[in-house]
Amino acid sequence: MKKYVISLFMLMFAISVNAQNKEQVIEPLPHMVENLELRDLRNKPTHMPYWGDKNMLIFYVDPDKHRQNHDFIMDLEENKLAAGPNIEGFGIINLKDTVFPNSIVRALARKRTEKNKAIIITDTDCNVAKEWGLGDCNNMFVLMIVTKEGELVYCKKGEFSKTDQEEFLRIVNKYR
């Protein structure tokens, strides 16, 4: 009986490690991605806006780290450094990795979007990270560029250095 329990435990551990590794797979850029069904701020099913019509600047944010890169993002918005006729930006809140209740995060996001008219949708199960091969996005602010053809051409996670900011501006200019 003891051997059976130990074998069962080892099997469960191996399955758990394998499942975690699948979520951690990072695909090299560029690669094609799909428009996923996510949730709006009222928790209704929705898809990503602008898909197939415009290049997309996507802010994929863990609410626990929403202030990461704050100064850089404010500079982008205020000075329209990533704006252009061929690109639109929107946010996706990574609800799976936050300690905050989803309803509170959605309510705060609704309040903010009423003021700034930004488009924000939510990802309740880290589907964007898993399906797009982003790897672990917990506690990270992720900035991505997806072409209107559905190709993920830029992805940077975490805190941006000055060099990262310059690289992003150089790349985003191609898609504006």
Where are these regions (language model features)?
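Structural micro-motif
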Residues: 33-34, 115-119, 134-144
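N-terminal "domain-start" segment that seeds a small globular fold
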Residues: 20-47, 67
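Thiol-/selenol-based redox modules, centered on thioredoxin-like
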Residues: 139-176
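Short active-site neighborhood of thiol/selenol oxidoreductases, capturing the structured segment around
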Residues: 47-72
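Positively charged n-region of N-terminal signal peptides that target proteins for export
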Residues: 1-4, 19-20
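Structural microenvironment flanking redox-active thiols in thiol-disulfide oxidoreductases
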Residues: 66-113, 129
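Sec-dependent N-terminal signal peptides
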Residues: 4-13
